[in-house]
Amino acid sequence: MSAAIDWGRMAAPQADGYDTEVTLRLATTSSSPLRPDPYRRRPVDGAPTLFGGRVAVRNRPSGGLTPPRYAPASPTHPNLAAAEKLLEAWPDIAVQFPQLIDTIQPWTDTTMTPEFWLSVPGSSSHSLEDEFGIIMATVDSPIGLAQALVHEMAHHKLRALGVSLLQASRLVTNNPEDLFVSPIIVNRRRPMTAVLHAQYSFIHVTALDVALYDAPGASEDQKRHAIYLLARNVPRMEAGFEEIEAHVETDAEGAVFVAAFMSWSRAVLARGREIMDANGYGIPAL
């Protein structure tokens, strides 16, 4: 099947849904060492839902984000619907998300107050390779949750395309024992597959930040939060861009995919810089 894939259209979300269709086809017809069975969409089974009844919201039966800091949140927490609404700022993602994701597992950070999240938006989140379609995320901040949803969806997509966190079956050919600087986990070097995962997921986050700022009718609070998040994300994504550009090794398909990803990234980061500069948040690139 991979020979028929237009890898130049698989990096950024496509308006016609091409990348969504291919990702689902790969997820439902293939496996990986960490996902031994092909994906089968989980039924809603009466759970509360988002995205027009397509995405179930239910608490995780066991495991998940680590207690006591994190505790299960209500599946009807109002920030879930608020985050869904925020994704509408990026129409291609708003359409793609409920096709690739079937379950959101909500959590809360017990160490932070509601007032904290009003000034410092964010979310803790996680997803597992053997659970394609499931996202765990804290719901305390609507914009932070929206970021977490696209962040973890991007991880799921990249895994389905053949790039796991520590190894790859296609696209990336770097030796897993060779380590590089991650734009996110900065205290230790990581395999190139992990660096690409960090960059790919957070470019999605950064693109959402740009979309939230540029959205017609965006409130001043939404713009303020988007600027704050861009100031946090753009410099480290610029550093990650340089690390990947200098060191990634690919097969023929990966060369096309990475070129398309870097082209999209360049446009996202350029717009992010413009927004920061226009609002007095311009800071030196790392």
Regions found by a protein language model. Give the residues of each.
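N-terminal low-structure segments adjacent to metalloprotease catalytic domains
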Residues: 1-59, 281-285
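Auxiliary, metal-adjacent structural segments of Zn-dependent hydrolase domains
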Residues: 60-129, 142
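Short, charged/polar micro-motifs that form catalytic or ligand-binding hotspots
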Residues: 69-73, 135-148, 186-198
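Extended, well-ordered protein cores
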Residues: 123-125, 150, 160
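Post-HEXXH active-site segment of zinc metalloproteases
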Residues: 139-148, 156-188
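Active-site/pore-lining binding-face segments in mid-to-C-terminal subdomains
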Residues: 179-239
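Pan-zinc metallopeptidase signature
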Residues: 224-286
